[in-house]
Amino acid sequence: LAAGSDPNQADQEGTTIQYLKPDTSSYFTSSAYEKEMTRELTKYKGRETIQITTENYMEVMELIYLYPNDFVGKKVTYTGFVYNDPQTKGYQFIFRFGIIHCIADSGVYGLATRGSDQTFKDNTWVKVTGTITVDYYQNLKQSLPILNLTEVKEVGQPDNPYVYRVF
């Protein structure tokens, strides 16, 4: 997904390229991070439907990747732009540009989606609704939370396409 990125260069420069999952763990001790994520998870645990907004986008995405089984079966709605992975047919990623602390840790964050017979060109903004499952994603050789789409609607780009991690 991060075409042209060189992990060795990133290590030398002290930067990382982030995509899919926001990761704020480097800003906490491990016990403080676990405590903070557990506290945040309680806000969503009892809900069957989760509206992901500009304000909670990074928080919810980080929680979905940390605790995917707690989100399986939940209905999720959010807005983002389309990225078509050229190596995997049937999946589209829906991303937002996100900033955790500063521009050096910015990236694209979101979920792989499937289930819509509609296809959209890269960078098309859409509002999606679907149900979370966890499946093995061959391209990344790992299990990922996947949004099985029930609704997709093309929308305009938000005034500010960026989302921010707020504590």
What feature does the model see in each segment?
Residues 1-167:
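OB-fold and OB-like single-stranded nucleic-acid-recognition modules
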